[in-house]
């Protein structure tokens, strides 16, 4: 979303909100799609659990540790990630977040040992760290304080939408794709649900601008 100096001037003098409405229509639906992709990558391990544990002979303890270690990586790197977002530029860093978590999430399809499971879940947390705070920070670049409450509320509406879509989609993949190309349903789940993250990550480089300045 390249911004010209004249457009920036329009935003500065926008008295009836028409320019901000245009920006909202351009940014918010796209960022909601990005959040949906983030949600799918974060929770698909829960949908994959039964098939994955059966195929790999993992115990519930192994699964629980692997599922939880995601948040360790996420918490440790959340603040550094947002510092780097500010230094590197929003579109570059958010794109990096999405592409890297997509690739790591896809690699989950080829896990064979508990150690591989732990490492990839931790790295997934590291990769995804800072995404939501980073997007919220990015939105503050485009909207004044009077607009931020409603814009952030619209973005966060992606949370229930993700819950509505994520479960049925994951169930369909597990049921319909199991055995295709010799891969189990849980493997296809990790592969299919990470493709949108990678595609959207590259789309960010074309679609977003670092700031209004």
Language-model segments: which ranges?
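Cytosolic juxtamembrane N-terminal segment immediately preceding the first transmembrane helix
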Residues: 2-43
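Extracytoplasmic
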Residues: 26-60, 76, 166, 170
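Residue-level signature of mid-helix packing/kink "hotspots" within the transmembrane helices
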Residues: 43, 71-79, 129, 163-164
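Helix-breaking motifs and short loop linkers at transmembrane-helix boundaries and internal kinks
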Residues: 57, 89, 110-116, 127, ...
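Conserved MFS/SLC helix-loop-helix module at the cytosolic interface between two early adjacent transmembrane helices
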Residues: 76-115
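Glycine-rich segments within core transmembrane alpha-helices of 12-TM secondary carriers
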Residues: 149-175, 197
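Symmetry-related core transmembrane helices of the 12-TM Major Facilitator Superfamily/SLC fold
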Residues: 185-206
